[in-house]
Design a protein with these regions (language model features):
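A compositional/biophysical signature of low hydrophobicity enriched in polar/charged and small residues
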Residues: 1-108
Length: 108
């Protein structure tokens, strides 16, 4: 499983729904959507600021989480930004290999 972070904003229609039914459990509904793609929300918080929520999600791959995003956005619930956790040490090792085989453009 890969670890992802999702930052999201809700649409005006979603806010209208919250006002009409302030008791709805948005975390449970989000978890059900994630589970449909064999993903699991391991943490979710609502925020003040540029984003309305942040979630930590474990999923098999990016495509499964992208399907969740498409569903969320297609229903006009809001917008999501998916960020994937990476192994920076492994990336640095690969960059070292790439660098040893790269010739930068000559500067004039």
């Amino acid at each position: 499983m890969s670890k992802f972070f999702v930052l999201g904003t809700y649409s005006p229609e979603s806010y209208e729904g919250f006002i009409k039914n302030p008791e709805q459990d948005r975390k449970a509904l989000a978890q059900a959507l994630a589970k449909a793609m064999n993903a699991e929300i391991t943490g979710m918080d609502f925020l003040r600021g540029s984003y309305d929520f942040i979630a930590t999600i474990e999923a098999n791959n990016f495509e499964d989480l992208a399907a969740v995003k498409l569903t969320f956005e297609a229903t006009r619930a809001g917008k999501m930004t998916i960020l994937e956790s990476v192994d920076i040490n492994e990336i640095a090792k690969k960059a070292g290999t790439a660098m040893s085989n790269y010739v930068p453009p000559a500067s004039n």
